[in-house]
Amino acid sequence: NLNPGSNTIKFEGYGSGFFKLSGKKIKTPILIFPDRYIAIKSNKKNNIKNEIINYSNEYKIDLIIYGNPLGLESSKDLITKELNSLNIPLEIMNTDAACRTWTVLVSEGRCVCAFIKPQR
């Protein structure tokens, strides 16, 4: 668990093709942790997996959220397989639900990470 505070990353907005975090509009997929985020320029699954492993060496991650426009339809894609291999609980949902779920869980002080692709 982390203490929710002013430095916790929260969504300020999201919509078709973008996220707004910390006053910045981001148009790429993001990997987000309670205290930082990374704009992912391409879907290099090894980079995503390695970043999560590095973070989990620092903090015990309660949950990984995978948000994408296809929701559960993406449950057989390569990213899902890589995330499942980490042996951390994984929830797959559509992008909007992932943004809302992220906001609720970090406000509760939960240590979650999420890989979220913008809606099209």
Predicted features along the sequence, with ranges:
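A short acidic, glycine/proline-enriched capping/turn motif at secondary-structure boundaries
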Residues: L70-E73, A97-C99, R120
